[in-house]
Amino acid sequence: MQLTALVHSVEGDSFFTVIKDGRKVYFYLQKNLVKKFYKYLNKGAYVVIDYEDVPVKRKNVCAHKINHFIAISVPKYRYNRVVYYDLEVIRDGIRDLVSSINPIMFIDFEMNMQDYQAIPNFEQEIIETGMVLTNKDGAIIKIKHWYIKPTKFPRITKRAMKFLHYTNYELSKAISFRQFYKEFAQIVKEYNPYVIVWGKSDITQLKKTCQINSCPDLKLRFVNLLQLHTNYYNLKNSPGLFSMWETYTNSKLPEQKHNSLEDALVTKDVFFKFKETIIK
C-alpha cells in the first residue's frame, strides 16, 4: 500500500509514526532502509511510502513494515521544500542516462584465484576479458576476447583452471597484461565509450591489475548497471545478472560457464532490455 503523510514522531532506532484517520500509526524500517533514510526522518518531514498493509509486532509495538520510500522532503520557509529523496527524480535521471550514452562498451573480467593450498601474499589479477562495443541502438561495432597471463603470480592456479574450465588451448592464447592494456587502451581512445559493468568488482579489479603492472589508470566512464537496477526498482537485495536476464527474456539460461565474453554479451542484453522497459 502507499501513503502520503507527515511524520508525527520518530521513536527508537527504526520506528516512526504518522497520524492516519485520527490515530497514531507505527511504521518500522529494516536495517538497509535505516542506514539509507533514517537520518532524514524528523518530526514534520513529508514522506511518501510503500508499506505492508498488515502490521506485525516489533519490539512490543504493532507496526507496518516499510517496503520502500518514494519521496522524503521537509518544509523550508513558506512555499519551499528541501527534497532529500524522490524516486521519480532518480528514475528520470536514469532514463536520461541510458537513452543518451553512446557508444557503449560492455565488459566482464575473470580473475586468477587463490589456490586450494593458500599462496602467501596472493593477489588476484585479471586473466580473461570479454568486451562488446555497440552503438546506442545495440548494433555491434566490435567484439574482443582476451586471455591474459597473470604477472605477480605468473601461474594460473589449479582452482582457477577448474572453475573457468581452462585447457591448454586457453593458456596458449594468453598474452601479457601490458599487451592487453595496449590493445584495450587503443579501443578506448578511438571510441571513448561509456563502460557498462554489472557491480563494482570489475571496476576495482581493473584498477588493481593496472597498479600491479604499473599501467596508468584509464579513467573510464564506468556505469554500474546493477546499481541502476537497484535504484530504479528500489530493490532491497541486489539481483544477479543472470536472474535479470531470465526475468527480462522469460527464458532459462544454459548452465553458466564463467566465460567473460559470454557474460559481456549477457550484460549487453540486460542493458537493452532494461532500456526498453523503462523508456516507453
Task: Give the positions of each predicted feature.
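Conserved beta-strand -> loop -> alpha-helix junction used to position metal-binding or nucleic-acid-contacting
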Residues: 218-229
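N-terminal accessory regions of nucleic-acid-interacting proteins
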Residues: 1-102
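Active-site flanking residues adjacent to catalytic metal/cofactor-binding acidic residues
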Residues: 107, 223, 262
